[in-house]
């Protein structure tokens, strides 16, 4: 898994 994807996913969840 690419860290960038993980960071993006976490960022979106935090944005919710």
UniProtKB/Swiss-Prot annotation:
Highest taxon in the source lineage: Eukaryota
Keywords: Amidation, Amphibian defense peptide, Antibiotic, Antimicrobial, Secreted
Tissue: Expressed by the skin glands.
Gene Ontology cellular component annotations, sorted alphabetically: extracellular region
Main location: secreted
Cell compartments where the protein resides: Secreted
GO biological process, one term: defense response to Gram-positive bacterium
Protein's job: Has antibacterial activity against the Gram-positive bacterium L.lactis (MIC=25 uM). Lacks antibacterial activity against the Gram-negative bacteria E.cloacae and E.coli, and against the Gram-positive bacteria B.cereus, E.faecalis, L.innocua, M.luteus, S.aureus, S.epidermidis and S.uberis. Does not inhibit the formation of NO by neuronal nitric oxide synthase.
Protein name: Riparin-2.1
